[in-house]
């Protein structure tokens, strides 16, 4: 699927139908179908040939494809094992992608990823955004750049001023 744009709704529907995959909304599986948003995330990740980048929850490979197109050295985590057949189909031509089918919240990130200076990109489901952010912060990994698409409510909590209504543990963890 080298020439297919995975951010196109028709391509997503075709791929999902072809491999018999149905999104699991209990896992927050809502796939990006806005090419402009996917391109903006990939551009903001500041990637070039060989840049180590970690993607959290690859989904059907929409953002994964855009990140891989930069030539970055991409390691993607995916929780849902049933997406393997989708990702094998959509990303088969890319040699710079390594996918780990494991829950990033339970993975030994330091052992898996080592001490390289990482960039991190993701389209995060609402229900797990805070646990993922806290896991990454507490992992001790050398991550120099985070680029996440998330719900506005979570972003508001992250950016809240001290003492504001949305101020909390997430605010403190991210800002300090």
Language model features: what each stretch is:
Residues 1-176:
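Catalytic cores of RNA-modifying enzymes
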